[in-house]
Swiss-Prot record:
Listed GO CC annotations: cytosolic large ribosomal subunit
Species this protein is from: Methylococcus capsulatus (strain ATCC 33009 / NCIMB 11132 / Bath)
Protein name as catalogued: Large ribosomal subunit protein uL22
Gene3D superfamilies for this protein: Ribosomal protein L22/L17
Quaternary context: Part of the 50S ribosomal subunit.
CDD domains tied to this protein: Ribosomal_L22
């Protein structure tokens, strides 16, 4: 039994979010939630909400036992990029890229 949850267009760069996602891959959901709760990275809060949604989906839709669930797959893809300008000297401008992420978490009891 598998349950999926996604957070699309999260306002955090994929590079920063993947650091947290790599830590919880393959863990028991209780251990993953503990790790995310005590991490002081912004991405940990976002990934934690997606993980909690996946657990709720497994429990409600599939009737799964929460104690047996594991994080089967977690990955972070690039979302759309917001392009902004920063004024510089002599009338020039630099481009600032505000990156977004698509966070996907799949939990399974296998």
């Amino acid at each position: 039994m598998e349950a999926l949850s996604r957070h699309r267009t999260a306002r955090i760069s994929p590079q920063k979010c993947r650091l947290v996602a790599d830590q919880i891959r393959g863990l028991n959901v209780a251990a993953a939630l503990d790790l995310l709760t005590f991490s002081n990275k912004k991405a940990a809060g976002l990934v934690k909400k997606v993980l909690q949604a996946a657990i709720a989906n497994a429990e409600h839709n599939e009737g799964a036992d929460v104690d047996e669930l594991r994080v089967k797959t977690v990955f972070v893809d690039e979302g759309p990029v917001l392009k902004r300008m920063s004024p510089r000297a002599k009338g020039r401008a630099n481009r600032i890229l505000k990156r977004t992420s698509h966070i996907t978490v799949l939990v399974s009891d296998n």
